[in-house]
A protein has these predicted regions:
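Strand-connecting loop/turn motifs
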Residues: 29-32, 120-122, 162-164
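C-terminal beta-signal and terminal closure region of outer-membrane beta-barrel proteins
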Residues: 68, 76, 88, 136-173
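Residues that define the transmembrane beta-barrel architecture of outer-membrane proteins
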Residues: 17-21, 99-104, 161-165
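Single conserved hydrophobic/aromatic residue that forms the stacking wall/gate
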Residues: 1-11
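Outer-membrane beta-barrel pore domains and translocons
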Residues: 28, 39-41, 128-132, 172
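Membrane-embedded beta-strand positions of outer-membrane beta-barrel proteins
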Residues: 36, 125-127, 169
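Repeated loop/turn-to-beta-strand initiation elements of outer-membrane beta-barrel proteins
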Residues: 31-35, 115-116
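Extracytoplasmic gating/loop element in the C-terminal half of outer-membrane beta-barrel translocons
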Residues: 41-124, 128-130
Length: 173
């Protein structure tokens, strides 16, 4: 029985992407400039390592669709403080597609004409957004995870990079 179980255990998925994609756009029209940076990773799988321990602390929203008896959910186990079935052991239950595409940076600027100014060489006003959008089906916090080589493809529940919007002014004398 043990040998049969060991044969069933195998590496099914890969944390390494099949391909990566990136796209940069720099556009200047009259006194306006636009810069867009994107990035994507496709074909990698992520193990939601943080979710296994949620059974002992907070409960995810998926607990509402848990197994409650015959004919109910086949994807969420029953709710229990004592896990007699060992439902939190590493398994494919916690693995999902980690493919994503991100709009990392968008910057729109306007360059003011300073030809007749005595002290200023250039003035540029800009609006910038970072980490604006992530397109993914991944249910975790962020499919782009931090971690070392030993944590490749394991989501430890780290907080994702924040979305920020800022306004700036460049002045050259």
């Amino acid at each position: 029985h043990l040998l049969r179980r060991q044969r069933q255990m195998c590496i099914r998925d890969s944390p390494f992407a099949d391909f990566y994609i990136g796209w940069n756009l720099n556009l200047n029209v009259y006194d306006f400039d636009l810069s867009v940076t994107t990035y994507g990773s496709f074909g990698n799988d992520i193990f939601r390592g943080y979710e296994r321990n949620l059974n002992y602390t907070n409960k995810p929203a998926s607990i509402l669709s848990r197994w409650t008896g015959p004919g109910t959910s086949n994807t969420e186990p029953r709710a229990s403080f004592v896990d007699g079935n060992n439902n939190i052991r590493p398994s494919t239950r916690y693995v999902e597609d980690g493919s994503y595409f991100k709009i990392r940076n968008v910057q729109l600027g306007y360059n003011f004409n300073m030809k007749n100014s005595g002290y200023l060489d250039a003035v540029r006003l800009y609006l910038q957004g970072k980490n604006l959008m992530t397109f993914t089906d991944y249910s975790g916090f962020d499919p782009e995870m931090s971690g070392g080589v030993l944590d490749t493809g394991i989501d430890r529940g780290n907080y994702p990079s924040p979305r920020t919007v800022s306004v700036g002014l460049n002045v050259k004398f």
